[in-house]
Amino acid sequence: MSGNTYGKLFTVTTFGESHGAALGCIVDGCPPGLELSEQDIQIDLDRRKPGQSRYTTQRREDDQVKILSGVFEGKTTGTPIGMLIENTDQRSKDYSNIKDQFRPAHADYTYMQKYGVRDYRGGGRSSARETAMRVAAGAIAKKYLKDFHGIEVRGYLSQLGPVKIETVDWDQVDQNPFFCPDASKVPAMEEFMKTLNKEGDSIGAKITVVATGVPPGLGEPIFDRLDAEIAHALMSINAVKGVEIGEGFAVVEQRGSKHRDEITPEGFLSNNAGGILGGISSGQDIIANIALKPTSSLHIPGRSVDVHGNPVEVVTKGRHDPCVGIRATPIAEAMLALVLMDHLLRHRGQNGGVQHRIPVIPASAK
């Protein structure tokens, strides 16, 4: 199919383009009875929206969400929830010079090869602008998970170019424009971004996303393993080129005696697996990292070709994020929440009546 829908029981279908009239989504499968308002959703949209600092794109969108259906008298009804965000600050003329050119490392070339036509204005459907609706849908999932099951999904920027985070203070994440959990690293990030802006270049980043309070048992082996679904969801985010669950690629250098998460009656002694064993949640924190590439929408000229195959020099004049990772934290949170929400409903549907006397092992013995 066309790939615009995610989920099996809790489904999200998004629509809209970067410079179109609006963005929208349909959330189907949300259980009835969840207290929900536009403000509940707006909180996360405001964390993601552009134009809030000198370090992100200066395109200014209010991203005011409208709930069109599925909510009555402040509660979800169990019917499809329709949501809409109007685009108000498009500047399509910035892209007229590249309408027949393929920007290097963008989806321009591949979209033309696949569809034979493309919306060149701001990348059209391939733009990260689309993720606003993922955040809106994810806000619903996050609220249901927390209100009804005590599951909390949070994230932070763990690396910006060469600046790595060593200390995590959750209270600091929303206190700076980087979603940085270490206040002592913010000045270094600011200086790095100032230099980058002067050079007209861009940089990559790493985001860490964590879900706490997840019960054991979520995940559907074999092909819908929880970690496989999380990787799928996170890789679907624009610019993501790598996903790690738990220790990820660091396991290459670990020995089995260190990597195995030993178990005691008091709880697990470590969490190298990132809260997932055999594709099923273990009850520990679910931890994932994503690596986002540097955007190639630059003021620095780059070589490419046009739609006729002629060599051209491409310079992007539009407004862009010099580091797409700065605003990606709410997006990563949303995608992890959507996976957990879908699997929670799937687990309840198939295994809700399962009874056993196996004790629940505490997430950590520490």
From Swiss-Prot:
Recorded catalytic reaction(s): these are: 5-O-(1-carboxyvinyl)-3-phosphoshikimate = chorismate + phosphate
**Pathway this chain belongs to:** Metabolic intermediate biosynthesis; chorismate biosynthesis; chorismate from D-erythrose 4-phosphate and phosphoenolpyruvate: step 7/7
Name the Enzyme Commission number(s) assigned to this protein: 4.2.3.5
> What cofactors does the UniProt entry give for this protein?
FMNH2
| TM stretches of this protein | none
* Top-rank taxon, per record: Bacteria
Q: Which GO terms describe its biological process?
A: amino acid biosynthetic process; aromatic amino acid family biosynthetic process; chorismate biosynthetic process
List the keywords (alphabetical): Amino-acid biosynthesis, Aromatic amino acid biosynthesis, FAD, Flavoprotein, FMN, Lyase, NADP
What PROSITE patterns does the record point to?
Answer: CHORISMATE_SYNTHASE_1, CHORISMATE_SYNTHASE_2, CHORISMATE_SYNTHASE_3
Query: Which GO MF terms are attached to this record?
Result: chorismate synthase activity; FMN binding
Question: InterPro entries in the record, alphabetically?
Answer: Chorismate_synth, Chorismate_synth_AroC_sf, Chorismate_synthase_CS
Residues engaged in binding FMN: R125, S126, S127, N238, A239, G278, K293, P294, T295, S296, S297, R319
Family annotation (SUPFAM superfamilies): Chorismate synthase, AroC
> Which positions bind NADP(+)?
R48, R54
Gene Ontology cellular-component terms for this entry are: cytosol
**UniProt cofactor note:** Reduced FMN (FMNH(2)).
Describe the task this protein carries out. This reaction introduces a second double bond into the aromatic ring system.
What does the subunit section of this Swiss-Prot or TrEMBL entry state?
A: Homotetramer.
Matching entries from HAMAP family are given as: Chorismate_synth
Under the heading PANTHER family, the entry gives: CHORISMATE SYNTHASE
Protein name as it appears in the record: Chorismate synthase
Q: Which gene encodes it?
A: aroC
